Amino acid sequence: YYNTCFAIRSGEEYFMTDAGGGNGILRILEEMQVPLNRIHHLFVTHEHTDHILGVIWMIRMIGTAIKKGNYEGIFHIYCHDGLIDTIQTFCRLTLQKKFCDLIGDPIQLIPISDRETRQILDMEVTFFDIHSTKARQFGFRAVLPDGKIVCCPGDEPLNPLCEEFAKGADWLFHEAFCLYRDREIF
């Protein structure tokens, strides 16, 4: 766990959430002994720099591994449809063409929508719009194989419209720690 970046392991594979604000995520993953070639699913909550800039480093490093034959399969990046162009633009402006050319296949940017449920690894993951007034942002609720529930409702106070996703969660990964009604105070 790093800021609001975290990875859930299932067997030898990982589902990662956000990637931090730069290449520091690479050091954190190394320290946590999370191999890049085992991360095949990444969810990006929103466009703020402390959540999205590390995605570019992930694409670069996983792209390098793909080019060297050290990464098998597809790298799935899930985000709301508005972030797809943002990520592609960042990549186009900062990465070599050989990495940008991997976007589409084997690096896939996958748009998700409010209340959409997907099977990711061995988890049932439901994405939801957190109803942010600052920047469009999504969270998720995942049911793990053992029935435990993980909820990541983003980095703003939990909007009452999203309570159903957090209710009953065994693990709640949240960056904001105040009630929605108190958001202007904090």
Model-based region annotation:
Residues 23-76:
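Active-site metal-binding motif and surrounding structural segment of the metallo-beta-lactamase
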Residues 1-32, 136-154, 171:
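Conserved beta-strand hairpin/beta-sheet module of binuclear metal-dependent hydrolase folds
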Residues 26-27, 53, 85-88, 160:
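Alpha-helical elements of the RecA-like P-loop NTPase motor core of helicases
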Residues 17-20, 40-46, 54, 80, ...:
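Active-site neighborhood of phospho(di)ester-bond hydrolases with catalytic His/Asp-centered motifs
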Residues 110-168:
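Catalytic core of the metallo-beta-lactamase
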Residues 21, 49, 132, 157-158, ...:
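Short, glycine/acidic-enriched loop or turn micro-motifs at the edges of active sites
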Residues 157-186:
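Cap/insert and terminal regions of metallo-dependent hydrolase folds
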Residues 71-136:
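Metallo-beta-lactamase
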